[in-house]
């Protein structure tokens, strides 16, 4: 029997399940479409130059609107909130929003798992206040320890040392364990895989290698630039013996691998070569309040209009529940020449 024919049995916790039996447990909330980097796989500078028109402020969800939406999603079973962008740390007064989100409680009274993904450029300045506001952990995007290679990936001249200092600040503030995401693109930064792994083993951060993905249409994605997760694991294992580790929770997207010598662990996110659609429990809200049920979605659902109308919470709850009940996304499972021509939303706009 194919997996899509067999609904998955989640554990009876509250909330809807989609047409493939997947519950809604994770919500990624973009707080801005702006970013100070121009990463080649997300916002290439050739397209998103200095004159690019980002969203005007009145089209971006307010902190109050974000918090209201998050509270409704939590009532439907969401247990993990991740704040994203763009680059979320460019959003003014972000610790205030973190405090508002941290105050939300699950139906059973438990606290949420509140996390944030950042490029790390402003972490030294903000890590302490984010932790004080209730943030639990951070994930930092870092594609190389070499300044030249890092610049080739992020599109600007920004010192690796400042990102590393931001990671140190996050650890000092208690936002640990820090995870570091490394997108690997053949011909640009695959030579950085072993240096990054060595650094992660020495510092205790959890490094996660991400296959270069075809999100949006601006990054010029080509399959031959993808370094398969299996190759990455083989590269690591040739230096340090590794063994597979069990996932820490249902729906975890990274395959976990443990160093046999006790030197920590690393992860691989293999959306291209080993899709994880069957366990995807994620919903996404963009900075302008559009709900997406897949990272590769062609369109979404306007929550901002509901949030800014006179609609009471139960009406918005019903709308979100209906959207999830009808969800049947599995783009990565179906990836082909045909799907590559479908319209898709850019990663920075959706809040990947």
Can you say where each PLM-predicted feature lies in the sequence?
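Canonical Radical SAM [4Fe-4S] cluster-binding loop centered on the CxxxCxxC motif
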Residues: 19-61
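Short flanking/linker segments adjacent to small metal-binding domains or redox-active Cys/His motifs
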Residues: 80, 324-352
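A short acidic, helix-capping loop that chelates divalent metal ions and anchors anionic groups
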Residues: 49-53, 124, 146-154, 216-220, ...
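Accessory C-terminal segments flanking Radical SAM cores
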Residues: 216-332
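Radical SAM enzyme [4Fe-4S]-AdoMet core and its adjacent flexible, acidic
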Residues: 8, 148, 156-164, 168, ...
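Conserved, mostly hydrophobic/aromatic
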Residues: 31, 39, 83, 207, ...
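Recognition helices and adjacent regulatory flanks at domain boundaries
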Residues: 1-24, 37
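Radical SAM/AdoMet-radical enzyme domain recognition
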Residues: 63-83, 90-210
């Amino acid at each position: 029997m194919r997996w899509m024919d067999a609904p998955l049995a989640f554990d009876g916790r509250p909330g809807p399940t989609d047409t493939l039996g997947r519950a809604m447990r994770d919500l990624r909330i973009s707080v801005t479409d702006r970013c100070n980097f121009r990463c080649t796989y997300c916002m290439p500078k050739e397209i998103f130059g200095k004159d690019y028109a980002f969203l005007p402020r009145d089209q971006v969800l307010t902190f109050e609107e974000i918090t209201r939406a998050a509270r409704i999603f939590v009532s439907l079973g969401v247990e993990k909130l991740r704040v994203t962008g763009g680059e979320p740390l460019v959003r003014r007064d972000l610790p205030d929003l973190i405090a508002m989100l941290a105050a939300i409680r699950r139906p059973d009274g438990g606290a949420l798992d509140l996390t944030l993904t950042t490029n790390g450029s402003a972490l030294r300045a903000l890590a302490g206040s984010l932790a004080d506001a209730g943030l639990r952990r951070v994930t930092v995007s870092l594609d190389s320890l070499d300044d030249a290679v890092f610049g080739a990936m992020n599109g600007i001249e920004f010192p690796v040392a400042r990102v590393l200092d931001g990671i140190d600040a996050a650890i000092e503030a208690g936002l640990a364990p820090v995870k570091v995401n490394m997108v690997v693109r053949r011909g640009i930064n695959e030579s950085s895989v072993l240096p990054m792994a060595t650094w992660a083993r020495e510092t205790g951060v959890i490094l996660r290698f991400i296959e270069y993905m075809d999100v949006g249409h601006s990054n010029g994605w080509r399959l031959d630039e993808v370094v398969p997760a299996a190759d990455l694991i083989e590269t690591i294992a040739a230096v340090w013996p590794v063994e597979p580790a069990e996932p820490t929770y249902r729906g975890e997207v990274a395959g976990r691998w443990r160093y046999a010598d006790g030197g920590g662990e690393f992860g691989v996110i293999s959306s291209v070569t080993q899709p994880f659609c069957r366990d995807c429990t994620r919903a996404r809200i963009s900075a302008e309040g559009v709900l997406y049920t897949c990272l590769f979605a062609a369109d979404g659902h306007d929550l901002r209009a509901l949030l800014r109308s006179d609609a009471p919470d139960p009406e918005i709850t019903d709308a979100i529940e209906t959207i999830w009940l009808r969800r049947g996304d599995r783009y990565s499972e179906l990836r082909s020449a045909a799907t590559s021509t479908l319209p898709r939303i850019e990663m920075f706009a959706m809040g990947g």
